[in-house]
């Protein structure tokens, strides 16, 4: 085999998987789709297996108020929360007690605790990411509902990677925090390209960003 032939084989060997990934992205990346599919008013949650990520504090409060307004009778629920966030866990458990149903709970280790140095947080961040990756691979929800905390970003991208690899078909629904009136949060900006549905609560945001949905204030 001469040098030119060997070079052609090498280029083809490298380029083929890259091309396959790019084609796959064209099919699954929501930001590359035309927004016609979100012009019609749709139910936020339909009958499915739903995962709900609780981000602690105000994010958990907003999420619980949103959930309380949805018809969840035919929805199988799994709650994802940060390890040690007992307040969020208690709110989810209280909701399930009032609903008279049972559900699953998945704790995700914190990537970084308050006051922890950035250097010492490297191993804990890696551990949190790997734990989340394994947990999501086992769980593979039909729909995951997120609303803004930084914790949701790695979880969403892990699920998107699994979609890219054909391991799941999770629909990612992101609801921007009510506090965001004129500009999306950093989490929102990061998740806008990969979210199947992206919902804002202020018309000013709806006018600024393509692909977003607006149904008024949800909480």
Curated annotation (Swiss-Prot):
Record's keyword annotation contains Membrane: yes
Gene Ontology MF term list: N-acetylglucosaminyldiphosphodolichol N-acetylglucosaminyltransferase activity; protein-membrane adaptor activity
Entry keywords, A to Z: Endoplasmic reticulum, Membrane, Nucleus, Transmembrane, Transmembrane helix
Pfam families: Alg14
InterPro entries xrefs: Oligosacch_biosynth_Alg14
Transmembrane segments: 9-29
Gene Ontology, cellular component aspect: cytoplasmic side of Golgi membrane; lipid droplet; nuclear membrane; UDP-N-acetylglucosamine transferase complex
tRNA-binding listed as a keyword: no
Subunit relationships: Heterodimer with ALG13 to form a functional enzyme.
Family: Belongs to the ALG14 family.
Protein function: Involved in protein N-glycosylation. Essential for the second step of the dolichol-linked oligosaccharide pathway. Anchors the catalytic subunit ALG13 to the ER.
Protein name: UDP-N-acetylglucosamine transferase subunit ALG14
Lineage of the species this protein comes from: Eukaryota, Fungi, Dikarya, Ascomycota, Saccharomycotina
Gene designation per UniProt: ALG14
């Amino acid at each position: 085999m001469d040098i030119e032939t060997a070079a052609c084989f090498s280029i083809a060997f490298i380029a083929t998987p890259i091309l396959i990934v790019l084609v796959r992205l064209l099919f699954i990346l929501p930001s590359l789709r035309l927004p016609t599919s979100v012009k019609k008013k749709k139910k936020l949650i339909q009958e499915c297996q739903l995962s709900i990520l609780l981000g602690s504090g105000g994010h958990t409060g907003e999420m619980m108020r949103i959930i309380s307004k949805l018809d969840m009778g035919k929805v199988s629920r799994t709650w994802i929360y940060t390890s040690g966030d007992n307040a969020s866990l208690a709110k989810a458990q209280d909701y399930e007690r009032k609903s008279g149903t049972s559900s699953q709970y998945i704790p995700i280790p914190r990537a970084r605790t308050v006051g922890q140095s950035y250097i010492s947080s490297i191993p804990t961040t890696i551990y949190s990411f790997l734990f989340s990756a394994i947990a999501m691979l086992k769980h593979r929800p039909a729909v995951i509902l997120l609303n803004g905390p930084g914790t949701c970003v790695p979880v969403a991208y892990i699920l998107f990677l699994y979609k890219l690899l054909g391991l799941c078909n999770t629909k990612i629904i992101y609801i921007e925090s009510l506090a965001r009136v004129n500009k999306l949060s950093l989490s929102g900006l990061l998740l806008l390209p990969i979210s199947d549905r992206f919902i804002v609560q202020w018309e000013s945001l709806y006018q600024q960003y393509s692909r977003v949905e607006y149904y008024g204030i949800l909480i």
